[in-house]
Amino acid sequence: MMRRHLLNAGDLSRDDAIAIFDDADRFAHALVGREIKKLPTLRGRTVITMFYENSTRTRVSFEVAGKWMSANVINVSPAGSSVGKGESLRDTALTLRAAGADALIIRHPASGAAHLLADWTAAETGEDGPAVINAGDGTHEHPTQALLDALTIRQRLGSIEGRRILIVGDILHSRVARSNVVLLDTLGAEVVLVAPRTLLPIGVDGWPATVSCDFDAELPAADAVLMLRVQAERMNGGFFPSVREYSCLYGLTERRQALLPGHAVVLHPGPMLRGMEIASSVADSSQSAVLQQVSNGVHVRMAVLFHVLVGTQSAEEEGAA
């Protein structure tokens, strides 16, 4: 049973994930052909987004998801709030709870920030506070990204169980990689992490995945390839000799794309560094599901908001989609 919050991919059972996928598909279908994309599902609910890091896809898709479900969506940013005057995250959280927030969606540079938010908003009265959804906390996790990636794979390949999925690039700094490894393992996939040793975290051998430093060798047996951006903003040293050498060894070029099976799907959580980890021709090819991921991001986040705010019944049973 899915909890009130979504803080980690590990919060989700296989049944939880499948229910979210099914409801995401239902919401997508319910919106087809509507001149005005509005469902009454969350009418009267207040959803507040708190983005302390830059974001395009995640922030926009959460806002669109809430608005398409008729929620009141309010954005709180450091620059335009008392955070810019030095207010702590805890005081901001308690203020938003007192103002009547039903859900708080947070992206923060500190790992564990979403957990603290959930604890703080519940501790004052001992009652359930607002639902908290982790939209990315430091290098820790990004569970809704893992959900939309997995849904995209399911739509493209028909199933996830037994599929061999490569996650390639900056594993060390990637919350997307961490959440995907956990969720894909829960769903029965075989996950292979491909990266130079310098971009693999300590303890990676204990993850439910195998590790390889040879990209070319892994491609012929891959069903899906998830490419990751090198997160230079989180680096303070030399993790590889040069951009050119990194791209040569770990970039998804046309030559490497030709090594993939014809059915394989290429994914990227964005933003893409074209010409570094992925060639433009590959990103724009028929095997690429990058824009499908963006579309699925809205529908998955609609489903997540539905589950944390309405309950564990499906959207179909509730008549919400």
Swiss-Prot record:
Pathway: Pyrimidine metabolism; UMP biosynthesis via de novo pathway; (S)-dihydroorotate from bicarbonate: step 2/3. Its EC number is 2.1.3.2. L-aspartate binds at residues 85, 175, 229. It catalyses: carbamoyl phosphate + L-aspartate = N-carbamoyl-L-aspartate + phosphate + H(+). GO terms for biological process: 'de novo' pyrimidine nucleobase biosynthetic process; 'de novo' UMP biosynthetic process; amino acid metabolic process. One of its GO terms (molecular function) is amino acid binding. Keywords: Pyrimidine biosynthesis, Transferase. One of its GO terms (cellular component) is cytosol. Carbamoyl phosphate binds at residues 57-58, 107, 142, 145, 270-271. Coiled coil: none annotated. Heterododecamer (2C3:3R2) of six catalytic PyrB chains organized as two trimers (C3), and six regulatory PyrI chains organized as three dimers (R2). Catalyzes the condensation of carbamoyl phosphate and aspartate to form carbamoyl aspartate and inorganic phosphate, the committed step in the de novo pyrimidine nucleotide biosynthesis pathway. Belongs to the aspartate/ornithine carbamoyltransferase superfamily. ATCase family. This is Aspartate carbamoyltransferase catalytic subunit.
